[in-house]
């Protein structure tokens, strides 16, 4: 099955941030000039909705499983085990990732963390036992970058997506940091 990736479908899957504050502030200060301002569509709507988001999440998730550093052949035993023994859970993970992106982009779907933690997204608890190192996190970010390149996402949007992803590094690597403190 060949997937058709467009800028819209890629951004739908990975763009996790709303419009930058500077753009919104400028829009608020612009004179109305006798016209009513159109209400801005949510990021979810602008990016194509759940089906576009799901297609991109699917591609990215499969790429991570196949990645030699963080996937099935990882030197990290927890990652390797998850990507081999729990591979049957991947469809559910794709579903959860899709809900998460839809939720944070203003869509109608509500993401609820399966392992709530200190943050509403529960990323630290969901990843704690995987003991993901900062270098492994960076490799997943690089895989995301390769996915965005594959889909021909423009440089500015790619940078925004990667910045949004990087914002969760401390949460995702919390289990690794705790392990290092214990030794």
PLM regions: where:
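N-terminal secretory signal peptides and thylakoid transit peptides that target proteins
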Residues: 2-17
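C-terminal segment of classical bacterial N-terminal signal peptides
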Residues: 17-24
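Core of compact, soluble alpha-helical bundle domains
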Residues: 26-183
